[in-house]
Amino acid sequence: CKSDFLMADENPENIKGPCSSLSEDGHQDRKFDYMITNPPFGVSWKAEEDFVKNEAKNPDGRFSAGTPRTSDGSLLFLQHLISKMEPKGSRIGIIFNGSPLFTGDAGGGESDIRKFVIENDLLETIVRLPGYLFFNTGITTFIWILSNNKNKNKKNKIQLIDAEDKY
């Protein structure tokens, strides 16, 4: 990644790591206009549980919407990105497997996080992608597109796109 930055005449110091974005916010005081990511599917955050749960207690903390099961940190990555949104408007594109859409009990951590995203009108679009886009797996994946500055005609709406057979 740093070599790509150097070849593009960008500052490689903007690349943080190796570290976990959950316990070590490498861009603590920064906000971004656009963010695109593909966090690892089903990554455990058990090793960072104490840190994450402590930050979740802070109403201004990155994880204040809730904490999911420790076996899947996908929705923690989403909350991390939401915390980096510019107040004047940002967009996020994030690729998930189906877990963030469907797992968790009503009133549980995953459900609370989804509720936060919807009640704050952040979710703009979910696109279901074709299978086998990722090497050696037919897992179904989804692109979530979020915005904190939706067009007026998209306010309080979520667009669902089924692109499963478009590949």
Regions found by a protein language model. Name each.
Residues K2-R30:
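S-adenosyl-L-methionine
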Residues D29-Y167:
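A conserved structural/catalytic subdomain of Rossmann-like adenosyl-cofactor enzymes
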